[in-house]
Amino acid sequence: INPDVSFLEQIESFLKETEKLGRSGLMHHWVMIRPWDNALLGLIGFDHVTRTIQAEWNLGYWVRSSAQQHGLARKSINSTLEWLGAINEVIVELKVDPLNTAGLKTVLQTVSNWNGERSISGDSAVTVAGVRTLHHCHLIKTGPKMS
């Protein structure tokens, strides 16, 4: 989010881009909703913004702070990886800020469960809340027989 641009304008732009690229199969996003009150808990999605030669997709997610530490990210990641790999074998990048303890734990657990690996060549700087940090890259192979 850019603090110098209207929040609503940025959200509208994101939704338009997500819808357009989603319809063409270039991006897939889902919301995480609490079923009993329809509260928005997070987002998860794939796009083609990758840093490695091997990966076809990049997986990103966000879980609101009040919904963290309940396994929601892990369950959502596993579900989307299974969905993406239901037909073909696919390599997916996951990036994580190594200083984000909870995110790092989630990604490392996912990489371990899916027999993934660290990919230093895919490390890249990411700006979050105005702070630029080097995010570590991990690769996971998913496919019909992987999940």
Predicted regions and their residues:
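Acyl-donor (CoA/ACP) binding surface of acyl/acetyltransferases
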Residues: 29-147
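A short helix-loop-beta-strand connector motif used in the catalytic cores of GNAT acetyltransferases and
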Residues: 16-31
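Alpha-helical interaction segments
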Residues: 4, 20, 51-52
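Short linear sequence motifs
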Residues: 7, 23, 130-131
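Mixed-charge, polar/low-complexity N-terminal
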Residues: 12-14, 20-21, 43, 47-48
